[in-house]
């Protein structure tokens, strides 16, 4: 520093002492400055006061020499003390050089800067609030200072500033929030602790409504909640807990919509505490805001659904996620199916599938359902508990369906999540069928694929969804449209039957009984599509047919009309080109028909053949059952067409008898001994009126080798009374009771011809296969 420079009104002694390395001498100089400034205040000499402050600032506090900077700091503090209540007029000039010293490399100098600013603030009190942001900014840096003395000094200043803010009603929160939002993302644990402590203080001040600005800082708070320091996490939990209490207390002033996506992001984090806290907030938001949260459903589901598959290690998160899921589901009502028509202009705002899927961890979605719906977020700022339930919110399904489809397609996802997805789909088809049927073609393949799931419960829920699709009036169209995917389109063309056959199927009205739901649903155009593709899946995945086929078909018979299911499958199988599969499928359907309790009513309907509908069903089943000779006979036994059964067995002599064929005859004999055929066994007592039944059974006996089944049937026939009555002369003339006299519409001769035609086709295919094999064998020998 130039000793000859003029520092007036500061005397040379003061200047010399301010530059001294000893603190005591600098302190003496400060007292002299205080005395000098007091005189200027008494004289109201503002020019000289400003000159003193400027000199101390420019020539000392901002000097290159460290001792000069220390002298400048203590001198500025002395000026503030001397100015007293008038210091508010000069605060900018007093504070700025001191704050500059906060960045000094010398820790002692940073400490003196804290001390000087403490004295300045202590004198000015509330007058410093217009400069709060710069003070806060400086303090936030010192909070992370490595020097313990500096940190201690900054804490004293921090407490003083908090006291001033608490006792004042002039705090400018609007100007402060941008700075808070910026500083809240600091990764330093001391800076985080400093930020949290200030939020707690501001939250406790009655005149400061921090809740209005919660969307600005909520994301930062959740990030601080993941801090490694236990104390900081605890402090942050307290802050978030206080905010949540305020939200519950005053939901009308909460900007739910602006915070929804923030919660969605943190509900997907890997940190258990953050995830649980965010999920608890989401639960409260859904319950308090109601339908306001609907536009964010796809994001919420993206976050919530995976949590439903958590194990007991994350039981708390799982339980809260389940409440969120159930609460959100309840918000969807039948009125949501009508909103597009009531307000057609809003259709344009529906998010596209690309926009609708919420972004994953680390990025927030732009708006409701992940799309930028500014009209929604800007249009709602204040909600009341009552009004939110009736808020005119449009439910857009694109994003929701995409999320559900994505989770159902993910084979790694947990069972409970898949069940929840299927429950959602079922709920949406019940509440908003017209909207959902726009998405059915995209959902259909994955729903069919889910039938191969390992869990019975998943398959049950999947079948409920498929049954609802197949029976909902909203799915009734003139043309169900092309199926999704090339292989499904191929299956459609491969298994499709002519339209008249379909029309006849869909109009079939069977007896409503145990096989039907309480109110048998009307089948729509998707029903036939479902049957076609289900059979196609059984054809391509034989293990599914073997392991789950009976279970799937029995459940469908409970959910839908059993008669329609059997009628349609028989109709489709009649045109199946893979004859081996057709035979296998017919055998499976026949076993289900004869053994399942769910089909008791349908069996009774077929047993009597009293109505035209039952006769038509018999003829339809018969034509497909012809793919398997033994099942055809069992169908005749079920319907008490014993003469035709005998005629069929006579034709067995012309068939190729294989091991599989004999095994099926063996199973039929076992079935005859079951309760299902009790009526048939009792009819053996009436030999006179049932000669063809006995002949048919003897025919089966003659087909069997000497086996356990042969012995079983032989013993049964030995119990028939008066066997000589089998040779009755008038048996060909009389119409036995077993051959329905009241079924003139059934042309049994034509049915027998059809049986021969189908079996010849099977024989031809087998010969073609064996011919190719023989040809290959000959080539090998040569």
From Swiss-Prot:
Residue ranges, compositional bias (Polar residues): 506-517
Predominant localisation class: membrane
Tissue: Ubiquitously expressed.
Region called Mediates interaction with the PDZ domain of NOS1, residue ranges: 773-777
Sites bearing Phosphoserine, chain numbering: 517, 743
Biased composition annotated in UniProt, kind: Low complexity: 478-488
Subcellular location field: Endosome membrane; Microsome membrane
Highest taxon in the source lineage: Eukaryota
Entry annotated with the keyword Repeat: yes
Region (Disordered): 335-372, 471-517
A GO biological-process term: phosphatidylinositol biosynthetic process
MF (Gene Ontology): identical protein binding; signaling receptor activity
Entry-linked Pfam families: Vac14_Fab1_bd, Vac14_Fig4_bd
Written domain comment of the UniProt record: The C-terminal domain (residues 523-782) mediates pentameric interactions and is necessary for the formation and maintenance of the PI(3,5)P2 regulatory complex.
Record-stated family: Belongs to the VAC14 family.
Function of the molecule: Scaffold protein component of the PI(3,5)P2 regulatory complex which regulates both the synthesis and turnover of phosphatidylinositol 3,5-bisphosphate (PtdIns(3,5)P2). Pentamerizes into a star-shaped structure and nucleates the assembly of the complex. The pentamer binds a single copy each of PIKFYVE and FIG4 and coordinates both PIKfyve kinase activity and FIG4 phosphatase activity, being required to maintain normal levels of phosphatidylinositol 3-phosphate (PtdIns(3)P) and phosphatidylinositol 5-phosphate (PtdIns(5)P).
Name the UniProt record assigns to this protein: Protein VAC14 homolog
Origin species: Homo sapiens (Human)
Gene that this polypeptide is encoded by: VAC14
